[in-house]
Amino acid sequence: MTECSHCGRSIWRDDSRNGEYCQDCYDSLYETCTECGDDVCRDDVCYHNDEPYCQNCYDEINDSIIHDYYYKPDPIFYGNGQPHYGIELEIDEGGEYDDNAERILNIGNRINEHIYCKHDGSLDDGFEIVSHPATLEYHTKTIPWKNILDEALEMGYYSHNSGTCGLHVHINRAALGESVEEQENTIARIVYFFEKFWDKILRFSRRTETQADRWASRYGCSMDNPKESLKGAKTSGLGRYTAVNLTNTFTVELRIFRGTLRYKTFMATLQFVDLLCEMAINLTDEEFQTMTWKEFAKTVSADKAELKEYLKIRGLEE
C-alpha cells in the first residue's frame, strides 16, 4: 500500500499512477500528449485544435510548414462584399516536403497570409493548398494563383492527371441570405441545380463517375422542387463525401471539381461557383425549376471570360 501524494488516500501501489497518485488525482492533474503519449502536467499542457500536447510536440506542429489534416486557423476574410470562397486544391506525386510547400507559400503569401498547406491522407505523395476565404475579385486580382499553380507544376506536381486530387470550394453560408431561412432557401436551389443538371456538372467537373461516387457523390434526391431536394439531401445519410457537402457549420462545400494546375480551368471553376451563387441568391424556386442549362450558360458575362471559354471547350454551351 502507499498514499496518494496529492489527496493522501491509501491506494495499492500497482493501482497508482506515476507511482504517487490515485487515478482521480492523476486525471485532475495530468493529461496525455496526443502526439507522443507522455504525461503532461495540466499547467504545462499546450492545446492545438482542442487537443492536448506537450511543449515539444506543440512546437513541432506549429513550426511545420505542412500542417496536419485537422489544422484550422481562424479565417481571414479578404475582399469587400460577398460571397467569400475558401479554396482547397490538392496536388500530388511531387512529395510531401516542407521545402516544396514553403516555395508555394512564399509566392502566395508575399503580400498577405493568403494560403497555408495541409496533410491529406487521400493523396499518395503530396499535400493540400488551402486559401483563406476571399471574394472572386480578390482571388482574381490579388492572390497570385497563376504563379502558385506554375510553381507546383515546375516542382513536378500533378492535380488533374494524378487521379487522386480534387478542387473544393467553400462558400460562406452568411453570404447566402440575411436570415437562416434565406440561407437555407439558397442552399436548396444549389442542391436542386446539381441534381437537375448532374450530367452537365459532371462533364464540367472533369471527374469520372467512379471518382464522383467515391469523393463527391450525387444525393439522388427529389427534383420536384428545391425544398424537396434539400430535404432529401439532409436525410440521405451520405455524410461529407458529396458533391454539395452540407455538414459544415459555417460553409457549404462544393467537392465535385477535379483538381487542376491549369490557371484558366481553375478560374473558370471559381467563376462557375460565383455565377451559381449569384443566381441561387437572386432567383426564385420557380425560376430555377424552369431554367434550362442553355439559359444558365447564356448568363455568363464578359467579365467571366475563362468560364465562357471553358464551357465552349467542354461542349457545355447548350
Regions found by a protein language model. Give the residues of each.
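Flanking scaffold residues of small Cys/His-coordinated metal-binding clusters
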Residues: 1-2, 16-17, 27-30, 48-49
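Short cysteine-rich clusters marking metal-coordination/redox-active sites
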Residues: 4-7, 22, 33-36, 54
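Zinc-coordinating Cys/His ligand positions in small cysteine/histidine-rich zinc-finger domains
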Residues: 12, 22-30, 41-42, 51-57
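Short Cys/His-rich "knuckle" micro-motifs
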Residues: 14-17, 32, 43-46, 64-65
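Short metal-binding segments enriched for Cys and/or His
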Residues: 29-32, 36, 59-64
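C-terminal accessory/tail domains of diverse enzymes
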Residues: 58-161, 174-318
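Short, conserved phosphate-binding/catalytic loop or strand-edge motifs used
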Residues: 165-171
